Amino acid sequence: MFLYGENTKGRRVLPIERRDALPFILNIHYARRVPSISYAYGLFIDGKLVGCVTYGSPASPSICKGVAGEEHRKDVLELNRLVITDPSKNNASFLVGNSLKLLPKNKYIVSYADYEGWGHIGYVYQATNFLFTGLTNGHKDNFNNGKHNRHNGIDLNNRVMRNRKYRYIYITYSDKRKRRELLKALRYPVLKYPKGETRHYDLNNPKPCKEIEVFSEKN
């Protein structure tokens, strides 16, 4: 079996079990919640697992239909968690780029950069050739003591506006003809990449940190 990233500065990207991704998701990622996980891949540096990326079904059926319509709603996956503990240059894009090669073909991969909430631009997606399709629409979420309320009896007065996010889409394809077909079905416009300062958070105090730049613009 070919291992993506083999002999590339000691880095490898390999499939991992869901349980191997959980410590990264629950203890490091700012959301601190476990999403739907259909595929998980790890970044190994000199044999040590230092990061993971997970893909799963989008949380909302409307996301699936919104990408390319009813016909392709089952072809949509979401890159829903990306966690790197070794922030060395290009590790994040190396992990994402190589994991995309391991996913099933002829799928739409949607992911979001939380620009309004966390100051994320999405340079890792730009570096791995995702298509930029604009900002999501803002809408209100229901919360109870700061947590999403998934039960009946929602207090309509206890609602907050969800941050709009930059939406990125990648198409895995089996051949160029299929890529053209899937691209034609895409329901969002393809726009120029956004630029600007991007920020990350302190793992012990996950709030946006303006002064810390993670990915820098090169082009």
Spans of features found by a protein language model:
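Short amphipathic alpha-helix that is part of the acyltransferase structural core
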Residues: M1-S36
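Acyl-donor binding region in acyl/amide transferases
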Residues: R12-P15, G56-V160, Y170
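Conserved beta-hairpin
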Residues: I25, S38-Y55
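A short, aromatic/hydrophobic, helix- or strand-capping loop or linear motif
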Residues: P35-S38, G196-T198
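Short beta-strand micro-motifs in enzyme catalytic cores
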Residues: Y39-Y41, D75, R164-Y168
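A conserved mid-domain beta-alpha-beta active-site/ligand-binding segment of alpha/beta enzyme cores
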Residues: N157-R180
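Short, cationic low-complexity segments
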Residues: R180-N219
